[in-house]
Structure formats: structure tokens, C-alpha cells
Swiss-Prot record:
This is Cysteine--tRNA ligase. It catalyses: tRNA(Cys) + L-cysteine + ATP = L-cysteinyl-tRNA(Cys) + AMP + diphosphate. Zn(2+) binds at C30, C224, H263, E267. One of its GO terms (molecular function) is cysteine-tRNA ligase activity. GO terms for biological process: cysteinyl-tRNA aminoacylation. Binds 1 zinc ion per subunit. A motif ('KMSKS' region) lies at residues 296-300. It comes from Bartonella quintana (strain Toulouse) (Rochalimaea quintana). A motif ('HIGH' region) lies at residues 32-42. Disulfide bonds: none annotated. InterPro entries: Cys-tRNA-ligase, Cys-tRNA-synt_Ia_DALR, Cys-tRNA/MSH_ligase, CysS_C, Rossmann-like_a/b/a_fold, tRNA-synt_1_cat_dom, tRNAsynth_Ia_anticodon-bd.
Length: 502
């Protein structure tokens, strides 16, 4: 079995990855809160963990990897946006309209980015019973308390096992200093956080846990603990009915670096306290921040970019007539290619120029694949060097450098295999002879070009200049540029060719 090494946020070092069960490799990633269209920061996380999903599937087998990415569909931001957009509707109806629209758009956007569907995408509102049960377990074990129709987690209860703040590498004093000044009077300590809260009149609410007599809704952190339990523990022998702590740990938990504190710190506190474990997951992976043109992305700065706005932008010219779907899929793959050129843990600076450059390079890769359409029918294994690069903490920049070498060497099969693992290859574009993305490539392949060059050299040798020029012009019209030279050893005329750069 191939050795994988990843940087573990939990230990702050690279570690060999050994799954708990190689036939059931389990990955959980925090997904979006669906109150608005997803932005390119969301896109980075989605793309990074899609590549990880693809790598795990390659190593352990497609059917042996379980990837769960949750959907948060109950949140104060959702309530506020729904009320603003649909003031004519009752709030629950407005929320339903908003979340269905944004959920559908998120699915379309991620598909255009070349992402595989996760194994499961649980929605918070479908797991309220799991949340209530988990909260009641925490109350039973003395890790939570009820006050004024709230349930709060008691940070003091778990200071030593595991130490609260250890994941984020923060002391309690540091966290207290960063806490809000106006701490709710009903909290025992300022660092205690909400597991469940009452709903105001007109707000969405559900039956509360532990006999609380009013309707309420869950806190953000308990949602992920409950959904990961429901999807990655309970189906595999763990969960609240299991007394074995070792059965209540899964393999990998991922998300953006901004989630380390407080969200992931609080997830760990809840889950470890409920199950008596020292770890919630063995490996924690976080992608770095994203900036736009060197600045923090912010609506106030006017540089807030949604995935949808990129998919619908015209930043690249094509020869053929494209459908809107094809344009959006091309834009999505271009954005994906652009993001993967930065290591997932490093900050990423998104620029319009970089997107165009990435799109141009990706187009040239597809040109080669279209030329070598017949060669593409051969079945060859993925080059080990690409897997080696990705196996070392998902080193996508190094792996893409290898793909560039394949392109320069004209090795279409190796290039295509690598692109496929990266989620950059749409087979239908290569297989379709008259794909409008690459209209000038019709009936062209390297063998055809070589034959035409050989014929041109024969004509030049016979001094049939006009006929030789006709072949040159014919190939130029198809985007093929000829470069004449001489063999340094024999002195004979030679001709190299390349595709015109767009």
C-alpha cells in the first residue's frame, strides 16, 4: 500500500497516514452555510478536499472512501437574509425558499469546478434528533448545563482531558482576553458556548432537549459533531450506543484555517467529552486563507467574488460557438487549475491575470489531448511521480510541474492521466471530434501533422515551393506553427512544430 504523509494541525507536523480501517477510510469536511452564493474562499476548500478525496480513492479504492461534507441550513445569517429577501413571506417559508435556492446553486457551482459529489451531504435540519441526543449525553456526563432555556457547554469540565485550547494552541487566559466584553449573564464562565438556544417568536424552532419547555435551535458547533457522528461513527459500530471509545474516532477532519478556533476547538470538546475519547479525528487538515489582488476579500472593499460570478464571466475567447454550460464548465476548470498551483496550506492570492494565464495553459493542454485523440485510447497507468507528489502532503504545485513536463514532451497519455486525477479532465471534450471548444482541431492529430510535414520537406527538396507553401499555410490555418532548421550533424533540413499560443 502506498505511503501517504499529511500535515496534521493537531500535532503541527507531517505524519504518516494510516487509516483506522483501510476498507472504510472516513473523511469529514465542514461545508457551507447556505445563506448566500458560495464565494471563492469556499471554492478553495471544496477543491482542496476534492483532490484529497480523489487521491484517497486512487490509493484505497473508490468504494472504500467515505467523504461527508455537511450543509448548514439553520443559522442566524440564514434567518436575517431570508427575512430581508422575502419580507412578504412568513419567516419559515422565506427560509425554505432561500436555502433551497442557495443549496441548488452550490451544487451546480461545485460541479462546474470539476468536483466529485461527496458520499454524503447531510443537512443540519435532518439531524436535529442526533443533536438533541448528543446534548443530553453531555448533560448526563456533567459537561453541559441548562440555564434560561439554553444548554451551554462547560469548558471548565474538560480542562484536562483534552485540554481546551490545545488544538488552537491557545491558553485559557488568551481566549478569555479575546472573548466578547458583553458576556451573557447566564454563562458560568465567559468561554462556555451554546449547544442549544431558545427561538424567538416567529423564528424557526424545534423541540428542545432535556425537557426544556420552549422551541429552540442548535448552536453551530454541535451540528458538526452530530452529523459526523451520524455519518462516520454510528454506521461503523460507534455512536452513542457504543461504550468503546476507540470506535468513536474517524480518520480525517478538514476545513478552512479560519475554522480552527472556535469551531473545530469546540467540536473536539463536545465529541471527546461525549464519547470519552482523546481525539475526535486522527488527522486534521486545513487549507490556507485566500486574498483577492493582495487584499482580504470583503464586500466593503468591493472585491467579494462568488463562484457564480467567475463561472458567468467572459475572460477567455474561443473559436467555436459554446453553450452556457460549456463556458461555465471551462471557467470552473480554469479556476480549479489556478487554485491548485498554490499549496493548500499556503495563502492564495487570487488575481484576474492569474485566472486568464491558467485558462490559456489549460487550453494548450487540451489542444495536445485533442491532437492525440487516437493515442488517448490506450490504457496506461498513472505516472508514479504524480502520485508521489500528492502523497507528500498533497503537493499540487509539484505534481502540476510534472504535468507541464508531460505536456512539453508531448506525452498526452501521461498528461491526461494526471489531469484526470486532478479533476481537470472532461473526457467528452477530448472524445468529441467536433467539440466547439477546440474547433480548429478537427481531423488533426500528431501523425497527420508529421505526414504533412514530411510531404512539405519532400516538396522543398524537389524545389516545388508553391506546393510546400500551401501545406505550411494549411497547417497555420489550423493553428500549427512550423519552425524550420537544420540537423547539426547531417546538415539536412528539419521542421519542428507547435500550436499557436492564444
Amino acid at each position: 500500500m502506498r505511503k501517504l504523509r499529511f500535515y496534521n494541525t493537531l500535532t503541527r507536523k507531517k505524519e504518516n497516514f494510516t487509516p483506522i480501517d483501510a476498507t472504510k477510510v472516513r473523511l469529514y469536511v465542514c461545508g457551507p452555510t447556505i445563506y448566500d452564493y458560495a464565494h471563492i474562499g469556499n471554492a478553495r476548500s471544496v477543491i482542496v478536499f476534492d483532490v484529497l478525496f480523489r487521491l484517497l480513492r486512487y490509493v484505497y479504492g473508490n468504494e472504500h472512501v467515505i467523504y461527508v461534507r455537511n450543509i448548514t441550513d439553520v443559522d442566524d445569517k440564514i434567518n436575517a437574509r431570508a427575512a430581508c429577501e422575502h419580507p412578504e413571506l412568513a419567516l419559515n417559508d422565506a427560509i425554505r425558499q432561500l436555502t433551497e435556492r442557495t443549496y441548488s446553486q452550490f451544487q451546480q457551482d461545485t460541479m462546474a469546478l470539476g468536483c466529485l459529489l461527496p458520499t454524503s451531504q447531510p443537512r443540519a435540519t435532518d439531524h436535529l434528533e442526533d443533536m438533541r441526543s448528543l446534548i443530553e449525553r453531555l448533560l448526563e456526563k456533567g459537561h453541559a448545563y441548562k440555564v434560561q432555556n439554553h444548554v451551554l457547554f462547560s469548558v471548565r469540565s474538560i480542562r484536562n482531558h483534552p485540554h481546551y485550547g490545545a488544538f488552537a494552541k491557545r491558553s485559557l487566559d488568551e481566549m478569555r482576553a479575546g472573548a466578547r466584553v458583553d458576556v451573557a449573564a447566564y454563562k458560568r464562565e465567559e468561554m462556555d458556548f451554546v449547544l442549544w438556544k431558545p427561538s424567538a417568536v416567529g423564528e424557526p424552532g424545534w423541540a428542545s432537549p432535556a425537557g426544556i419547555p420552549v422551541l429552540g435551535r442548535p448552536g453551530w458547533h454541535i451540528e458538526c459533531s452530530a452529523m459526523s457522528m451520524a455519518k462516520l461513527l454510528a454506521p461503523y459500530g460507534g455512536g452513542l450506543t457504543c461504550d468503546d471509545p476507540t470506535a468513536n474516532v474517524f480518520d480525517i477532519h478538514g476545513g478552512g484555517i479560519d475554522l480552527i478556533f472556535p469551531h473545530h476547538e469546540n467540536e473536539i470538546a463536545q465529541s471527546c467529552s461525549a464519547f470519552g475519547t482523546e481525539r475526535m479525528a486522527n488527522l486534521w487538515m486545513h487549507n490556507g486563507f485566500l486574498q483577492v489582488e493582495g487584499k482580504k476579500m470583503s464586500k466593503s472593499l468591493g472585491n467579494f467574488i462568488t463562484i457564480r460570478s467567475i463561472l458567468e464571466s467572459d475572460f477567455f475567447e474561443f473559436n467555436g460557438v459554446l453553450t452556457d454550460e460549456m463556458k461555465q464548465n471551462w471557467a470552473g476548470l480554469s479556476a480549479r487549475f489556478s487554485m491548485l498551483q498554490t499549496h493548500y496550506r499556503e495563502p492564495l492570492n487570487w488575481t484576474a491575470q492569474r485566472l486568464v494565464q491558467s485558462s490559456s495553459e489549460l487550453y494548450r493542454w487540451y489542444e495536445l489531448l485533442c491532437f492525440e485523440r487516437e493515442e488517448m485510447e490506450k490504457n496506461e497507468a498513472l505516472d508514479d511521480s504524480v502520485i508521489d507528489a500528492l502523497s507528500d502532503d498533497l503537493n499540487t504545485p509539484k505534481a502540476l510541474t510534472l504535468l507541464r513536463k508531460f505536456y512539453k514532451a508531448g506525452n498526452a497519455i501521461a498528461l491526461a492521466n494526471g489531469m484526470n486525477l486532478f479533476g481537470l479532465l472532461r473526457q467528452e471534450w477530448v472524445q468529441e471530434v467536433e467539440c466547439p471548444l477546440f474547433m480548429r482541431k478537427i481531423s488533426l492529430n500528431s501523425k497527420f501533422i508529421d505526414q504533412r510535414i514530411a510531404e512539405r520537406l519532400r516538396l522543398i527538396h524537389n524545389k516545388e515551393w508553391a506546393a510546400a507553401d500551401t501545406i505550411r499555410d494549411e497547417l497555420a490555418a489550423k493553428g500549427v506553427i512550423l519552425k524550420d532548421g537544420k540537423d547539426p550533424q547531417t546538415g539536412e533540413r528539419t521542421t519542428m512544430w507547435e500550436m499557436r499560443r492564444l
